[in-house]
Protein backbone atom coordinates (compact mmCIF):
# COMPACT_ATOMS: atom_id res chain seq x y z
CA UNK A 1 0.00 0.00 0.00
CA UNK A 2 1.18 3.50 -0.72
CA UNK A 3 2.60 5.51 -3.58
CA UNK A 4 5.43 4.61 -5.93
CA UNK A 5 6.87 5.90 -9.18
CA UNK A 6 7.19 3.79 -12.30
CA UNK A 7 9.10 5.00 -15.34
CA UNK A 8 9.21 4.14 -19.01
CA UNK A 9 11.24 5.79 -21.75
CA UNK A 10 8.50 8.30 -22.55
CA UNK A 11 6.49 8.75 -19.35
CA UNK A 12 6.36 8.62 -15.59
CA UNK A 13 3.55 6.76 -13.85
CA UNK A 14 2.66 7.50 -10.24
CA UNK A 15 0.94 4.42 -8.82
CA UNK A 16 -1.33 4.89 -5.80
CA UNK A 17 -2.62 1.91 -3.81
CA UNK A 18 -5.18 1.68 -1.02
CA UNK A 19 -6.43 4.91 0.49
CA UNK A 20 -5.57 8.08 -1.41
CA UNK A 21 -5.79 10.58 1.41
CA UNK A 22 -3.67 13.12 3.26
CA UNK A 23 -1.50 10.34 4.70
CA UNK A 24 -0.16 9.82 1.15
CA UNK A 25 0.74 13.51 0.69
CA UNK A 26 4.49 13.26 1.32
CA UNK A 27 4.96 10.10 -0.74
CA UNK A 28 2.88 11.50 -3.60
CA UNK A 29 4.82 14.76 -3.58
CA UNK A 30 8.16 12.92 -3.58
CA UNK A 31 7.08 10.81 -6.58
CA UNK A 32 5.79 13.89 -8.37
CA UNK A 33 9.05 15.78 -7.71
CA UNK A 34 11.05 12.91 -9.18
CA UNK A 35 8.72 12.59 -12.17
CA UNK A 36 8.92 16.30 -12.94
CA UNK A 37 12.71 16.31 -12.64
CA UNK A 38 12.76 13.99 -15.65
CA UNK A 39 11.62 16.89 -17.82
CA UNK A 40 8.59 18.50 -19.36
CA UNK A 41 8.72 16.60 -22.63
CA UNK A 42 7.70 13.33 -21.02
CA UNK A 43 4.16 12.18 -20.31
CA UNK A 44 2.69 11.86 -16.85
CA UNK A 45 0.08 9.38 -15.65
CA UNK A 46 -1.42 8.51 -12.29
CA UNK A 47 -2.58 4.92 -11.90
CA UNK A 48 -5.57 4.73 -9.56
CA UNK A 49 -6.43 1.09 -10.36
CA UNK A 50 -5.76 -0.05 -6.79
CA UNK A 51 -7.29 2.92 -4.97
CA UNK A 52 -10.23 1.91 -2.79
CA UNK A 53 -10.83 5.27 -1.11
CA UNK A 54 -10.36 8.84 -2.35
CA UNK A 55 -10.76 11.94 -0.20
CA UNK A 56 -10.73 15.66 -0.96
CA UNK A 57 -7.05 16.08 -0.07
CA UNK A 58 -6.24 13.65 -2.91
CA UNK A 59 -8.18 15.87 -5.30
CA UNK A 60 -6.08 18.80 -4.11
CA UNK A 61 -2.88 16.83 -4.69
CA UNK A 62 -3.99 16.04 -8.24
CA UNK A 63 -4.71 19.72 -8.95
CA UNK A 64 -1.32 20.79 -7.59
CA UNK A 65 0.27 18.11 -9.77
CA UNK A 66 -1.56 19.47 -12.81
CA UNK A 67 -0.43 23.04 -12.13
CA UNK A 68 3.20 22.05 -11.60
CA UNK A 69 3.20 19.84 -14.70
CA UNK A 70 1.65 22.57 -16.86
CA UNK A 71 4.37 24.98 -15.73
CA UNK A 72 6.89 22.53 -17.24
CA UNK A 73 4.98 22.11 -20.49
CA UNK A 74 3.17 18.87 -19.65
CA UNK A 75 -0.35 19.55 -20.88
CA UNK A 76 -1.83 16.07 -20.84
CA UNK A 77 -2.07 14.01 -17.68
CA UNK A 78 -4.01 10.75 -17.67
CA UNK A 79 -5.64 9.22 -14.62
CA UNK A 80 -5.68 5.46 -15.20
CA UNK A 81 -7.87 2.77 -13.69
CA UNK A 82 -10.69 5.17 -12.84
CA UNK A 83 -13.62 2.94 -11.96
CA UNK A 84 -16.49 2.69 -9.52
CA UNK A 85 -16.42 5.04 -6.54
CA UNK A 86 -13.15 6.67 -7.63
CA UNK A 87 -14.49 7.49 -11.10
CA UNK A 88 -17.75 8.79 -9.63
CA UNK A 89 -15.89 11.20 -7.32
CA UNK A 90 -13.65 12.43 -10.15
CA UNK A 91 -16.60 13.05 -12.49
CA UNK A 92 -18.71 14.79 -9.82
CA UNK A 93 -15.70 17.04 -9.08
CA UNK A 94 -15.39 17.76 -12.86
CA UNK A 95 -11.90 16.29 -13.03
CA UNK A 96 -12.80 14.83 -16.41
CA UNK A 97 -12.40 18.42 -17.69
CA UNK A 98 -8.83 18.68 -16.37
CA UNK A 99 -7.51 15.17 -16.90
CA UNK A 100 -7.95 12.29 -19.31
CA UNK A 101 -9.80 9.58 -17.35
CA UNK A 102 -9.11 6.02 -18.45
Sequence positions of predicted segments:
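Amphipathic alpha-helical interaction surfaces in cytosolic regulatory modules
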Residues: 19-99
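General small-molecule cofactor/ligand-binding pocket signal
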Residues: 4-6, 80, 100-102
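Short beta-strand/loop segment at the start of cytosolic alpha/beta domains
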Residues: 1-15
Amino acid sequence: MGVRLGKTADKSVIVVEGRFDFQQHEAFRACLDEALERGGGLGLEVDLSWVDYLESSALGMLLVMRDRAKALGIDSIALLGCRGFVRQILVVASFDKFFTLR
